[in-house]
Amino acid sequence: MSSWNYVVTAHKPTSVTHSCVGNFTSPQELNLIVAKCTRIEIHLLTPQGLQPMLDVPIYGRIATLELFRPHGEAQDFLFIATERYKFCVLQWDPESSELITRAMGDVSDRIGRPTDNGQIGIIDPDCRLIGLHLYDGLFKVIPFDNKGQLKEAFNIRLEELQVLDIKFLFGCAKPTIAVLYQDNKDARHVKTYEVSLKDKDFVEGPWSQNSLDNGADLLIPVPPPLCGVLIIGEETIVYCSASAFKAIPIRPSITKAYGRVDVDGSRYLLGDHAGMIHLLVITHEKEKVTGLKIELLGETSIASTISYLDNAVVFVGSSYGDSQLVKLNLHPDAKGSYVEVLERYINLGPIVDFCVVDLERQGQGQVVTCSGAFKDGSLRVVRNGIGINEQASVELQGIKGMWSLKSSIDEAFDTFLVVSFISETRILAMNLEDELEETEIEGFLSQVQTLFCHDAVYNQLVQVTSNSVRLVSSTTRELRDEWHAPAGFTVNVATANASQVLLATGGGHLVYLEIGDGKLTEVQHALLEYEVSCLDINPIGDNPNYSQLAAVGMWTDISVRIFSLPELTLITKEQLGGEIIPRSVLLCAFEGISYLLCALGDGHLLNFQMDTTTGQLKDRKKVSLGTQPITLRTFSSKSATHVFAASDRPTVIYSSNKKLLYSNVNLKEVSHMCPFNSAAFPDSLAIAREGELTIGTIDDIQKLHIRTIPLGEHARRICHQEQTRTFGICSLGNQSNSEESEMHFVRLLDDQTFEFMSTYPLDSFEYGCSILSCSFTEDKNVYYCVGTAYVLPEENEPTKGRILVFIVEDGRLQLIAEKETKGAVYSLNAFNGKLLAAINQKIQLYKWMLRDDGTRELQSECGHHGHILALYVQTRGDFIVVGDLMKSISLLLYKHEEGAIEERARDYNANWMSAVEILDDDIYLGAENNFNLLTVKKNSEGATDEERGRLEVVGEYHLGEFVNRFRHGSLVMRLPDSEIGQIPTVIFGTVNGVIGVIASLPQEQYTFLEKLQSSLRKVIKGVGGLSHEQWRSFNNEKRTAEARNFLDGDLIESFLDLSRNKMEDISKSMNVQVEELCKRVEELTRLH
């Protein structure tokens, strides 16, 4: 049964909705704060660029984000209001680097009609009050007292009903607002009001301005000394104050965002709907405004926010394309643009459609999305895990270890790759043709297995074998010194760095050597009570060539110990528990924090934070990476250090926001890895797998990889055709001038290169609404079917459309058949060898007929009326599930004998659907326009017709995201041996660029996780005191109901980021061991 569902985010929202700049984390630091609908990110502006400081979820959809500075404060506070009428004031706590809540509250009213034009939240520049416009005809005031604390809120009646914008004016003795509104004759005006806090009412303001530009949409208040306000229209810009009125015409455009450049407010950046950025200058003599000037600077992504940072650097936040960090130059480039893009921040939003395909044919799903809009439209290929891009490979069996060596210590690149086998050691090097070929290092022993090698100080190399340690010159390649194991002893385990060697011989002997110029000196020897299983002396202190600590893994008592060097004094001993010995230990530092990693023989990995001065270990965490022994090695990529864990499920361990993250590598089993940074293959890795050695470069280190295919137009529908290895898309061309009607196309793309192979233009006013790849009964060909609508300006709903059937021949789209329809073809499905179409309010079934002349046509077989608009359709067997514009979900059945479709059951609630999917025979999933998810159940066991005719709502959840599409599939390799491999998953894509996964869990697992979720709610407090329970409660205009049969995977997986103490609190409340909790939550993270 798919009643118990787990909802988790695989890709966080990336669409930027708000941004602001100020001194938030300290009085001296300049911060950029970015809102991505349900998350906020805090960045620090440094000479090197933006440095992320915090990224946290907000339990609400952010409607307002404003920085302000209450009286007597040295730095700014952050005000956030959410769409569900909650607000909070946040302050930065430098001690814990977290947000503290200064104030919070609920500003909803029992009665009141929510505003059509979105909520407005503004703060008086003198911090006397916060103003909110949430309901038509009401202005809510939250006053500050003189200590900067918030007092009780009250409402003031506002006679303007169609409010477009409200802003506080600067330099007014009493708090004053300017209101831009539209009257009932569609004319636009601005009025000003003083807010009297004493009388809790408005007083007529200092000025008003009637009959503005019909497209006036935005007010920009101007700070002192000039004061007043700018009114931005589609064809004019007006400056207005009590004493002045100036206007200039502009090229027709819709301004979407603005950013103030100077403190005195004389210059503003304006971003329009086409991504053009302008500079608006208020010319003035002292405090008298003399005029306005506007200049085009260049093109950016289509801006939803603009924040001027410093030194001509600007953040452009976008909801329709990638956000950007740009520099405004004094002189234009060759194309006449003053805008230079310094950095791009990927945004998948809005994901209008997507499909799940296995492009590499490796059994791993990739999601290909239709992302962005207008000129910023693109396809994005999203896959989980880190790819290795193979540069060279050679067949080699039985590799036991690998190390790279330089020809001198200060060389930038590696020269040699030492490969060790059971009874020999081979040395490979790059020849002049950039090929790996065998060479010799005369001082190395080649007829034995090498246990360890390393570059050493004084241009030397060190080789450890089972009998000796050899020190060799890297320039002459001759032996300079050798240390022999005592008679009767052999070296079992060894490690080294540039100036130290640590090895263990049988019988628990630990021997420590130091490397001099041509000299190996045995410095210390210790006898331990058990055999040693692994060693590490990777330097993580200030000296890159010398370590003061050694990590030693032990047999028998299954412990890891930290010794000091050179004394070999035991500092710390940590029992690992269990029967499995440590196979690999590693000292490493990520983002300035030192860790000890310890890998066990069964694929588990423990990590500890480590105090390098005392050697003490804390914050122990255990994760399961695979099922086979793991070997750990560090490597660097883009100047950051990461760790590669080689095993049956190779993994890269890295750090982000001071948390350790694990990302799977898209390779089957890897036995050994070492960095190999050669001149021919810079920043590469050498990887030993079953029977071969591969040299390859590694992708950027992150969990999801996103490849962008810019289209320069808006792709609206996509599907993949395996047989022809192509994608079919319906797209809308980007017309530069708005006079022409827009053009729509069906395009064919190669599924590897993503190049356009063929294009079929649709008629004028014809939109592509749906696309499908399918085959028909008694016809072995595979076709692309496209459903269209003629969208005519004078019609409310399309009254005609077409179904087009194409075949791909020699890489071209050939039209085979077309069928006119009496409406828009919103959805197409392959159905029992026929074609099922949703056309306006009806469902229509077509069969594929062969005419006498050998041509083919679609012939209508039967249909079903009874929908408002049948927008989304899914099928399974003979069942058809329909998502309606406003009548929720209904279930239809096709009857073969009668050749008819009839309604079986429906959900009688009024839900405006945005997507549907079938989870199993009886449970159907839907998303609707209030950002909720719901599941309904077919009640075949019902006693009466009435019961059987009702789809019962069994699950409800507030996702807080608008879902455009569900698809069955997975982003991860399905490993048959894991429990997770058996869990069915559905992927969804949203307007804010979220890719999420809904997993249907067994009941026992669901019940366990439900307990964990409620324990976590008590421990993890929402930012700003916002409640998780309220946030996830199903909510529409009519009712609010607690979430049921859906769990929040993002909250559950945040368990892994808690400190050990908090984990233990939860473990006590649930009566389950911390390790067991970690293991079960870890498993879930593998779903995405």
Curated annotation (Swiss-Prot):
Subcellular location: Cytoplasm; Nucleus
Single GO MF descriptor: DNA binding
Gene Ontology annotations for the cellular component aspect, listed alphabetically: Cul4-RING E3 ubiquitin ligase complex; cytoplasm; cytosol; nucleus
Keywords (A to Z) from UniProt: Cytoplasm, DNA damage, DNA repair, DNA-binding, Nucleus, Phytochrome signaling pathway, Ubl conjugation pathway
Biological or metabolic pathway of the protein: Protein modification; protein ubiquitination
Known role: Component of light signal transduction machinery. Involved in repression of photomorphogenesis in darkness by participating in the CDD complex, a complex probably required to regulate the activity of ubiquitin conjugating enzymes (E2s). Repression of photomorphogenesis is probably mediated by ubiquitination and subsequent degradation of photomorphogenesis-promoting factors such as HY5, HYH and LAF1. Plays a role in DNA repair by forming with DDB2 the UV-damaged DNA-binding protein complex (UV-DDB). Component of the CUL4-RBX1-DDB1-PRL1 E3 ubiquitin-protein ligase complex.
PANTHER family xref list: DNA REPAIR/RNA PROCESSING CPSF FAMILY (PTHR10644)
Assembly with partners or alone: Component of the CDD complex, at least composed of COP10, DET1 and DDB1A. Component of the CUL4-RBX1-CDD complex. Component of the CUL4-RBX1-DDB1-PRL1 E3 ubiquitin-protein ligase complex. Component of the UV-DDB complex, which is composed of DDB1A and DDB2. Interacts with RAE1. Interacts with WDR55. Interacts with ATCSA-1. Interacts with DDA1. Binds to ASG2; the subcellular localization of this complex depends on ASG2 farnesylation status. Binds to KTN80.2/DWA3. Interacts with HTD1. Interacts directly with DHU1.
Protein name per Swiss-Prot or TrEMBL: DNA damage-binding protein 1a
Organism of provenance: Arabidopsis thaliana
Gene label: DDB1A
